[in-house]
């Protein structure tokens, strides 16, 4: 197949799959292996590389929040997790927790953990989303409290889970959003925190990939095309998802996406 068409396909997949509870890394790597015939290891490195495109999309979509976070850096040491520094504190601590768990998980478990285990974990995440959706549906009747800003426990929990999401078949967004929802954050806030957290994680993964092997499994021009497509499609799809959350009861979104996660995880496992 024409390399540019392959690049468009892979960028499209990355842009769509990044935000939903299906492993974008697994989907892009599988498509790359099937279409181009490169090794699974090279395809996985390419999938990690394409996260830079959706990181750009998240930065552009949440540009106001990113600007506010950068402006709050000076206040971080004096007032961590205050209203104006909560997002920055969350991202810094969660990113550190991701590094602490993600690097050892990659080095120790990457060769040992099978697609079966990753698929079952993704199905578990999907099941948690379904349960979360049902809890959201009956939250008012059960008088479940809501959290308005993240705290240190949220940051450590979500960061650890994001680090473990490097395992085969595990959805980063599905895992982190599920954790935030179960901690009492409302739907749009959970998406926002998860997507903001994806920016430093994706950029760090790209640095590792480029330092290790350079641009993997693809020529420079198709790589640029794939990045552009993933950024544009990622921006459009994250906007569509946020709009959906604003217009549709989030318990329904959780339930549907959780069902997708269960089905996707079982398909990987089988």
Curated annotation (Swiss-Prot):
Molecular function, one GO term: undecaprenyl-diphosphatase activity
Cellular component terms per the entry's GO annotation: plasma membrane
Pfam families registered for this protein in UniProt: BacA
Enzyme class, spelled out: hydrolase
Enzymatic reactions: di-trans,octa-cis-undecaprenyl diphosphate + H2O = di-trans,octa-cis-undecaprenyl phosphate + phosphate + H(+)
Principal location class: membrane
Record localization: Cell membrane
E.C. designation(s): 3.6.1.27
Keywords, in A-Z order: Cell membrane, Hydrolase, Membrane, Transmembrane, Transmembrane helix
Cross-referenced InterPro entries: UppP
UniProt membrane topology term: Multi-pass membrane protein
Transmembrane feature ranges: 88-108, 115-135, 149-169, 191-211, 214-234, 250-270
Family the entry assigns: Belongs to the UppP family.
Function: Catalyzes the dephosphorylation of undecaprenyl diphosphate (UPP).
Protein name listed in UniProt: Undecaprenyl-diphosphatase
Organism (species): Haloarcula marismortui (strain ATCC 43049 / DSM 3752 / JCM 8966 / VKM B-1809) (Halobacterium marismortui)
């Amino acid at each position: 197949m024409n390399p540019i068409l392959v690049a468009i396909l892979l960028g499209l997949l990355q842009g769509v799959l990044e935000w939903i509870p299906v492993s974008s890394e697994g989907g892009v790597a599988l498509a790359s292996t099937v279409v181009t015939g490169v090794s699974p290891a090279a395809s996985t490195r390419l999938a990690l590389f394409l996260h830079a495109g959706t990181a750009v999309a998240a930065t552009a979509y949440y540009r106001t929040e990113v600007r506010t976070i950068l402006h709050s850096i000076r206040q971080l040491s004096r007032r961590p997790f205050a209203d104006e520094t909560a997002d920055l504190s969350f991202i810094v601590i969660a990113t550190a927790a991701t590094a602490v768990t993600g690097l050892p998980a990659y080095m120790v478990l990457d060769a040992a953990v099978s697609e079966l285990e990753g698929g079952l974990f993704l199905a578990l995440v999907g099941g948690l989303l379904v349960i979360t959706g049902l809890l959201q549906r009956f939250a008012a009747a059960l008088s479940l409290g809501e959290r308005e800003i993240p705290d240190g426990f949220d940051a450590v929990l979500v960061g650890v889970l994001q680090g473990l999401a490097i395992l085969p078949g595990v959805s980063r967004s599905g895992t982190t959003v599920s954790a935030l929802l179960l901690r009492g954050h409302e739907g749009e806030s959970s998406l926002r925190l998860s997507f903001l957290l994806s920016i430093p994680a994706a950029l760090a993964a790209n640095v590792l990939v480029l330092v290790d092997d350079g641009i993997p499994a693809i020529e420079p021009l198709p790589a640029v095309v794939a990045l552009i497509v993933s950024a544009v499609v990622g921006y459009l799809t994250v906007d569509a998802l946020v709009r959906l959350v604003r217009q549709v009861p989030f318990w329904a979104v959780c339930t549907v996406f959780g069902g997708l996660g269960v089905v996707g995880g079982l398909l990987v496992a089988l």
